[in-house]
């Protein structure tokens, strides 16, 4: 199955045709797709109307610098702000993270979007792409926040996606623009980077997004192209039974599998349920690549939201004062 990107704030005729394809599981929305809150509601409805089956609509609404919907939405704190508070006030920090998850999920669902790919459970150890998206550099602290965040997302009716498996936070390279390799053995990863993923899976996380990072002491290919990582470790050893997403095949670190078709097949062959094709110019070739493949069409049904909440009153029960420990404006709508 493919999650595709679309070009703008309205669907084109070609994009409506793409949504008719059996392999299209849904759409990933970006800043380019956002004009206003009401426009996102209309776009989400148009996507569902164009598809002959239930589809998944997703976004990255993590908070901080990775927040695709801004005007009319709460300005959410980066996850690192909660980790920074934890040493002095752990219970308040966890309460803030739970409120952050509930508020984010409620606003996203009220816009007709099923899920935000969240939470980031990578360790905050200097990666250029992760940065303040991570809760902490301490595996146990990240694990504690992961449990709280997953539970809060579920309480707001949103599925939880752990990313980026098996851990993107320690390598320095940004896989959007460069290849990345982590030389540590599996035992070191199990003692550190995998700890939050174990916690998230135990908390009932619904999905995992793979990293485009190579761990050569474990497998020779990037994790998202690796049966060893997906089938043997994530599913076999760690017991994960949910949906496995690739990261975007338009990222530079994905190019090791060759062209567009090669990347799509490599992810599916490795055990990914869903391949992210975020760049519209790659969609047609990706659809051609999956012609004739057996696809896991049932995998995503559990991720589709439980029905959008109305925007009026969506904050009921949410203590917005906990959306950030540092700045009150993060808890109010912009």
From Swiss-Prot:
Name the GO cellular-component terms. Answer: cytoplasm
Keyword Kinase part of the UniProt annotation: no
Q: What is its main location?
A: cytoplasm
Q: In which pathway does it act?
A: Cell wall biogenesis; peptidoglycan recycling
Which molecular function GO terms apply here? beta-N-acetylhexosaminidase activity
**Which residues bear the site annotation Important for catalytic activity?**
174
What chemistry does it catalyse, as a reaction equation?
A: Hydrolysis of terminal non-reducing N-acetyl-D-hexosamine residues in N-acetyl-beta-D-hexosaminides
Biological process annotations from GO: carbohydrate metabolic process; cell division; cell wall organization; peptidoglycan biosynthetic process; peptidoglycan turnover; regulation of cell shape
Enzyme kind, highest EC tier? hydrolase
Record's PROSITE patterns? Answer: GLYCOSYL_HYDROL_F3 (PS00775)
Does the keyword section mention Cytoplasm? Answer: yes
Q: Which domain of life is it from?
A: Bacteria
Q: Which UniProt keywords apply?
A: Cell cycle, Cell division, Cell shape, Cell wall biogenesis/degradation, Cytoplasm, Glycosidase, Hydrolase, Peptidoglycan synthesis
Q: What EC number(s) does the entry state?
A: 3.2.1.52
Mention any Pfam family matching this sequence: Glyco_hydro_3
Residues reported to bind substrate: 60, 68, 133, 163-164
Q: Which residues form the active site?
A: 176, 247
* Compartments where located: Cytoplasm
Its annotated function is as follows:
Plays a role in peptidoglycan recycling by cleaving the terminal beta-1,4-linked N-acetylglucosamine (GlcNAc) from peptide-linked peptidoglycan fragments, giving rise to free GlcNAc, anhydro-N-acetylmuramic acid and anhydro-N-acetylmuramic acid-linked peptides.
Alphabetized HAMAP family for the sequence: NagZ
* Entry similarity comment: Belongs to the glycosyl hydrolase 3 family. NagZ subfamily.
Q: Which PANTHER family match?
A: BETA-HEXOSAMINIDASE, BETA-HEXOSAMINIDASE-RELATED
What NCBIfam families does the record point to?
Answer: PRK05337.1 (NF003740)
Protein name as it appears in the record: Beta-hexosaminidase
Q: Which gene encodes it?
A: nagZ
């Amino acid at each position: 199955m493919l999650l595709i990107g679309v070009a703008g704030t309205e669907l084109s005729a070609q994009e409506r045709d793409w949504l008719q394809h059996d392999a299209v599981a849904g759409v990933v929305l970006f800043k380019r797709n956002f004009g206003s809150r009401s426009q996102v509601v209309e776009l989400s409805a148009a996507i569902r109307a164009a598809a002959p089956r239930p589809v998944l609509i997703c976004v990255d609404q993590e908070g901080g610098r990775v927040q695709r919907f801004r005007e009319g939405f709460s300005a959410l704190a980066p996850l690192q702000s909660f980790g920074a508070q934890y040493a002095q006030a752990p219970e308040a920090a966890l309460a803030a993270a739970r409120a952050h998850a509930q508020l984010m999920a409620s606003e996203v669902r009220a816009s007709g979007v099923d899920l935000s790919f969240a939470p980031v459970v990578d360790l905050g150890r200097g990666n250029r792409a992760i940065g303040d998206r991570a809760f902490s550099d301490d595996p146990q602290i990240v694990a504690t926040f992961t449990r709280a965040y997953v539970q809060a997302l579920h309480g707001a009716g949103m599925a939880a996606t752990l990313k980026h498996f098996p851990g993107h936070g320690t390598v320095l390279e940004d896989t959007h623009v460069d290849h990345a390799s982590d030389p540590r053995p599996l035992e070191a990863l199990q003692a550190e980077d995998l700890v939050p993923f174990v916690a998230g899976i135990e908390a009932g996380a619904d999905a995992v997004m793979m990293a485009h990072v190579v761990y050569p002491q474990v497998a020779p290919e990037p994790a998202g192209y690796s049966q060893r990582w997906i089938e043997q470790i994530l599913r076999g050893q760690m017991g994960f039974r949910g949906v496995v997403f690739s990261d975007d095949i338009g990222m530079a670190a994905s190019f090791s599998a060759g062209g567009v078709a090669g990347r799509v097949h490599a992810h599916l062959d490795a055990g990914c349920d869903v391949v992210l094709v975020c760049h519209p110019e790659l969609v047609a070739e990706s659809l051609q690549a999956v012609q004739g493949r057996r696809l896991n069409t049932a995998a995503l049904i559990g991720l589709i939201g439980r029905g959008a909440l109305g925007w009026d009153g969506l904050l009921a029960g949410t203590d917005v004062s906990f959306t950030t420990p540092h700045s009150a404006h993060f808890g109010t709508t912009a």
